[in-house]
Amino acid sequence: FIIEHADIRKSLLNMKSIIEGERALCFWLSQQTEVSLYHPDEKIKQEASDLVSLMTPVVKTMFSDMGMEITSEAMQVHGGYGYTKDQGIEQLYRDNRITPIYEGTNSVQAADLVFRKLVNKNGDIINKYLEMVKNDCDSENEKLKPFTDELKMNLEILSNFTSWIKEKIQNSKDDASAACNDYLKALGFISIAHAWIKVLEVSFKDY
């Protein structure tokens, strides 16, 4: 059985971790959408609306890009059999190929994130989001520590990247434009990791 190969197990776990992490992120963003529409406190409504605005291009791009990568990896797991029509993987791959293109290509989504969302309210929205992620990493649950330590290390890299790209927006738009896709992907992976931290926080809780 191919499941006996460590590389196959790694591929399956990679697909599972991305899919379930994105699902958790989607649920969180849906919750923020509800809050932005119906919460009685106007300040909380606005904060949720800001988060939805910031994360919309991230979710659209990461979900469609990762959908492509995961479907391709699934085909690889099937081997040559996955390339044929028998298993349906090739159909999923072809169907998914349009998703990074329509509703604004993913490069357009990345440019929207960098040139509009990052500078909105003088960068206060992205700063608050990164601070929220950092605060959620400060859990007292020791079981979470290996995961939160890893996330905090990468969050520091993203914070430096954010400062760099904000500076480039002011002084070198070509450099900022060239880095748009990389920045969105970095923020996307941090967001998925943060969603997993929220899931693990509940899973590891002693009830």
Annotated model-derived regions:
Residues 1-207:
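Flavin-dependent oxidoreductase catalytic core characteristic
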